[in-house]
């Protein structure tokens, strides 16, 4: 890490929990490699404390920050401007402080689709099942539709406070892209079975299975897995969740959220600094399979 001076620019991650995050490693190493006078820190901030945290960071002149669970939706109402993709998604994971104006972006969809390509897959014309309706889910759904998926089926609890918003999101995304985007109740087991049976890709876009709850999984019935299915998990700690472990045992190809994190972070880095993250070096140092 570079020596911190009175001129050092601040960037950060706001979420809860954040102690497990490798974002500080990748960003601080990138700043060092490129000779940029910035530092990246993590702050444990939830939805209740987010408004005060953002106000304080803005006052202190932060250059930019990332949002992770559970803050990607709540942050929207605290910003001055949204990029086109953030407007479409309704969630933000990256904020730029442009001379006191906070501008929200969403690099999650971009990051996820880059990770799909890294894993050797192409979703063009394919059916996709997505679990969850949080900020990461909306970004992934939007990018999947924009990148040519035939259908995107979203599953969530009908009692979720985001249900109505997601219903409108699905209708709007379908109208804008021509992709069939539909919302289903998690408890509709028949719909879930049918959707996964017809899907090329199943994505867990929730925090289920993340440390410390590593024995939990979003898919309880392993008979839903089939060998033609690719299973992705946005969780990367642990690197192999129970979902991925059981899917692999059923003959599925699997990949986790590590490369999504890498690519969305690289995009955020470029937004803040105007420079490209040295991805190959960062990938080798921090994202090699353990």
Placement of each model-derived feature along the sequence:
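Phosphate/diphosphate ligand-binding glycine-rich loop within oxidoreductases
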Residues: 3-119
């Amino acid at each position: 890490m570079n020596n911190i001076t009175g001129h050092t620019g601040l960037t950060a991650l706001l979420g809860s929990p954040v102690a497990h995050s490798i974002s500080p490693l990748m960003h601080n190493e990138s700043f060092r490699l490129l000779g940029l006078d910035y530092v990246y820190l993590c702050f444990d901030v939830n939805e209740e404390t987010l408004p005060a945290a953002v106000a304080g960071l803005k006052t202190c002149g932060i250059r930019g920050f990332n949002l992770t669970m559970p803050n990607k939706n709540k942050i929207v109402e605290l910003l001055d401007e949204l990029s086109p993709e953030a407007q479409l998604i309704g969630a933000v994971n990256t904020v730029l402080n442009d001379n006191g104006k906070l501008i929200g972006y969403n690099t999650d969809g971009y990051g996820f689709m880059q990770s799909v390509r890294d894993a050797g897959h192409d979703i063009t014309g394919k059916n996709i099942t997505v679990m969850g309706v949080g900020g990461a889910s909306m970004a992934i759904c939007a990018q999947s539709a924009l990148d040519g998926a035939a259908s995107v089926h979203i599953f969530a609890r009908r009692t979720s406070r985001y249900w109505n918003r997601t219903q409108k999101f699905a209708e709007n995304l379908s109208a804008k892209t021509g992709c069939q985007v539909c919302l289903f109740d998690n408890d509709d087991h028949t719909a879930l079975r049918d959707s996964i049976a017809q899907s090329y890709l199943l994505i867990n876009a929730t925090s289920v299975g993340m440390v410390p709850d590593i024995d939990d999984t979003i898919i309880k019935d392993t008979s839903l897995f089939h060998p033609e299915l690719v299973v992705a998990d946005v969780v990367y700690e642990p690197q192999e969740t129970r979902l991925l472990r059981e899917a692999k045992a059923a003959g599925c190809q699997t990949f986790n959220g590590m490369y999504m994190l890498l690519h969305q972070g690289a995009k955020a880095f470029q937004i803040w600094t105007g420079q490209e993250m040295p991805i190959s070096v960062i990938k080798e140092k921090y994202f090699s399979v353990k």
